[in-house]
Amino acid sequence: MAAATRGCRPWGSLLGLLGLVSAAAAAWDLASLRCTLGAFCECDFRPDLPGLECDLAQHLAGQHLAKALVVKALKAFVRDPAPTKPLVLSLHGWTGTGKSYVSSLLAHYLFQGGLRSPRVHHFSPVLHFPHPSHIERYKKDLKSWVQGNLTACGRSLFLFDEMDKMPPGLMEVLRPFLGSSWVVYGTNYRKAIFIFIRWLLKLGHHGRAPPRRSGALPPAPAAPRPALRAQRAGPAGPGAKG
């Protein structure tokens, strides 16, 4: 039922479709009522994992292992009412492997409003950290942005694009947020999601990128290690929304 409301569904009879729409409308009314009576919705966090699986299966060619790992990690994280770490996902590969598409799907199926949700923060080095000489200010701003938004809502998603272009040392400020401590800087961050996207531009012997094997994941980049491991730990940038 949840998948139907997000647009990924098998088509059935008209009668079945009308019944599905009616059921979805009733469920939406109930959810809206619960949202007004308490903290049921946890900000904009409304995960639709069946819809995500459906969309990945229909529109992401190859990368079978990657799809399985992402869905498995999300299921375990979402179903845990009290996770001990934030969810940290690393999406890395060559152009055309679906990294950006997968990250947009994750935002779409986890948060109402998708990338436009105020709880989804999309960082681009070109837009938000263009001058390496300003690294100390960037560190201060990034730490403040993450801390402030997690204080406002623990269910937040932080998406870092083009990690290979980030100023050296900037991501070190995130290390405290990616561990297993209960509180960092007075903020509970264990329900947050961090996604790191890295483009691999390594060329082969003939000046071309190595061929992509179906279901194969490229080797993980070297640093920063806590940020670039797919693990169960886990802005637009400071001053902007995704």
Curated annotation (Swiss-Prot):
Residues 225-235 have a biased composition (Low complexity). Residues 27-189 form a propeptide. GO terms for cellular component: cytoplasm; endomembrane system; extracellular region; intracellular membrane-bounded organelle. Residues 1-26 form the signal peptide. Glycans are attached at N149. Amidation of salusin-alpha(29-Gly) by peptidylglycine alpha-amidating monooxygenase, PAM, converts Lys-241-Gly-242 to Lys-241-NH2 and gives raise to salusin-alpha. Residues 210-242 are annotated as: Disordered. Gene3D superfamilies: P-loop containing nucleotide triphosphate hydrolases. It is found in: Secreted. ATP binds at G93, W94, T95, G96, T97, G98, K99, S100. Keywords: Amidation, ATP-binding, Cleavage on pair of basic residues, Glycoprotein, Hormone, Nucleotide-binding, Secreted, Signal. SUPFAM superfamilies: P-loop containing nucleoside triphosphate hydrolases. Transmembrane segments: none annotated. One of its GO terms (molecular function) is hormone activity. The keyword Nucleotide-binding applies. Isoform 4 is ubiquitously expressed, with high level in vascular endothelial cells and vascular smooth muscle cells. It comes from the Eukaryota. Salusins -alpha and -beta may be endocrine and/or paracrine factors able to increase intracellular calcium concentrations and induce cell mitogenesis. Salusins may also be potent hypotensive peptides. Belongs to the ClpA/ClpB family. Torsin subfamily. This is Prosalusin. It comes from Homo sapiens (Human).
